[in-house]
Structures are given as structure tokens and as C-alpha cells.
Amino acid sequence: MAKFLLLALTFGLAHAAMEGPWKTVAIAADRVDKIERGGELRIYCRSLTCEKECKEMKVTFYVNENGQCSLTTITGYLQEDGKTYKTQFQGNNRYKLVDESPENLTFYSENVDRADRKTKLLFILGHGPLTSEQKEKFAELAEEKGIPAGNIREVLITDYCPE
């Protein structure tokens, strides 16, 4: 019983640390056109919110289309595996947290667009620019997921949308 309570407490603390204000620092994708400036999956995150014991995760972000920042909130629904969330945005999306530190959260996502094309993505959220060590770790993770390191885009410096 004690192990179960410790596990539940740890799970709750991890999700509590995940909630709050976060900004997209970098994005990687195997279809790099989707994350270039003006790309439909180049999102500028603002916050994560867990609801219903984190069975629902709300992600609030901006997309910048034609020079206009549009605020969007999506809700991801936790799937039976207890790790993956599913939502709709520019097609069907499945995403999960793959790395976590006090400074950054890294999510792996797969998007299947309306033309039935699959895109693998990594999003790293944080509060400031990545260190050299963090960049290297992100590049290694991208390669592990089948995303060329050359397809990483640092987006924090291009985020001109409102806070």
C-alpha cells in the first residue's frame, strides 16, 4: 500500500510541476516544412493545464499565420496506455511527455494531417534559450525518433506573439 501511495504522490507531483506557463523553445519535425515560419505546426506555447487528475491536458498556444498571432487552446485526452494524449489540431495528434527537467519539458508528437500524411515532431518547452548540453540532448532525441538533427528549429527567438 505504501508503494502505491508513493507512486500516486510522485505521479501527482510530476504533473503539478508540468502545469503552468511554458514557452516553445525548439521544434523538430521529419517534415520540416510543417515547422518553418508560417508552418501549420509551428506553435508558440503559453501554458499547460492538467484537469481531471491529468486525464485531460489543455495546451494554450499561438500560431502565426500571415503575420497574425491567433490564440488557440486544445484539449488532449489521456489514452488507455496512461502516457499518450490524443487531440485534434491540423489533423489527428498523439503526443506524450518523453523528457522532463525543472527547466524543460519535451513532448514527442505524431500528426496525421487531412491528406493522411504523418509527421513526427518533438517540442521542447521551457523558460529561456537552451544550453549547449540541452541542444545536444534534444538533437540526440530527435535522431532516436527518426527526425534529422538538421530539422531542429529554435523558435523562441521568433516568438513575437503576446504573452
Swiss-Prot record:
UniProt keyword terms in alphabetical order: Disulfide bond, Olfaction, Secreted, Sensory transduction, Signal, Transport
Tissue specificity: Expressed in nasal mucosa (at protein level). Specifically detected in septal and lateral nasal glands.
S-S bonds: C50-C54, C69-C161
Gene Ontology biological-process annotations: sensory perception of smell
Pfam families in the record: Lipocalin
Main location: secreted
PTM characteristics: The N-terminus may be blocked.
GO molecular-function term, one example from the UniProt record: small molecule binding
Compartments where found: Secreted
Superkingdom classification of source: Eukaryota
Record family assignment: Belongs to the calycin superfamily. Lipocalin family.
Function in brief: Binds the chemical odorant 2-isobutyl-3-methoxypyrazine.
Oligomeric and partner information: May form a heterodimer with OBP1B.
Name the UniProt record assigns to this protein: Odorant-binding protein 1a
Organism this protein belongs to: Mus musculus
